[in-house]
């Protein structure tokens, strides 16, 4: 409970829950606190090969976030040690950025080139299209696996707490959080050497966020991600890329350092 309060007190979406739990905690004695029965998922990303020095190059691209929100002259390169936090006021612009580099949409101008050694895996913000099927979770995940053995597939589902009969439930009845956990199983299964994640923490509980946080910190390859969870971003990112309608601000700093620069500019 203390971990939840500490992590989400400043999170707009979960601040009320954090406040409520703090009030409950303040009223409880140590003897009254129940033993936790919560289980933690296990997130462990492995790479099929080491990424080359240059992972991705984007030059003079344009992304359209809708409603007249456009970012022009998008130019940056991604190195094999970069863990980039994508930030900015407009969520639609960030999603368009991910769709561009995941090659789901194209820029009307400019160049986008992935390195020859790179295999990337993309976690989209909206994953509903992946689950419009009545396949069991075992068969759903089997679609994305070279290894078809059920025990092997169940191992990746089990990491995200889909064990026993849970692994046989239909993919089209999952909650938002369950869909995210399945997508993370799929991402782990890919063995990609570059990970792209658009708001992966949005529907996760504290245990799953912590597991993903640890998994991305330990991952030796490049990552581009965005999240509303402050601790998640601060402990993973070594570079911040800010998207604005006026262009891109690219800084090799931590998230907290970036926040300080924003405060300084406002003074």
Report the location of each language-model feature.
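ABC ATP-binding cassette signature C-motif
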Residues: 45-267
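Flexible nucleotide-interacting loop at or near the entrance of a catalytic core
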Residues: 1-73, 267
């Amino acid at each position: 409970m203390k971990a939840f309060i500490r992590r989400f007190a400043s999170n707009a979406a979960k601040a009320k829950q954090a406040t409520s739990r703090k009030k409950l905690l303040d009223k409880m004695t140590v003897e009254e606190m129940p033993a936790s029965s919560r289980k933690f998922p296990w997130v462990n990303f492995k790479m099929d090969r080491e990424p080359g020095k240059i992972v991705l190059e984007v030059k003079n691209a344009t992304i359209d976030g809708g409603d007249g929100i456009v970012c022009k002259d998008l130019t940056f390169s991604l190195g094999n040690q970069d863990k980039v936090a994508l930030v900015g006021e407009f969520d639609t612009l960030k999603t368009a950025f991910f769709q561009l580099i995941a090659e789901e949409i194209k820029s009307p101008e400019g160049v986008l080139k992935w390195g020859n050694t790179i295999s990337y895996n993309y976690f989209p913000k909206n994953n509903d299209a992946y689950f419009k099927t009545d396949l069991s979770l075992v068969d759903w995940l089997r679609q994305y696996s070279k290894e078809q053995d059920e025990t092997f597939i169940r191992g990746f589902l089990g990491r995200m707490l889909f064990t026993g009969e849970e692994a046989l439930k239909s993919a089209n009845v999952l909650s938002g959080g369950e869909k995210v956990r399945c997508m993370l199983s799929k991402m782990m299964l890919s063995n990609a050497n570059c990970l792209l994640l658009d708001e992966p923490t949005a529907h996760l509980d504290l245990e799953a966020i912590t597991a993903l946080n640890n998994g991305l910190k330990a991952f030796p390859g490049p990552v581009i991600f965005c999240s509303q969870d402050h601790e998640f971003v601060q402990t993973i990112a070594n570079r911040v890329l800010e998207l604005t309608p006026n262009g891109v601000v690219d800084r090799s700093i931590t998230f907290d350092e970036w926040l300080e620069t924003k405060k300084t500019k406002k003074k």
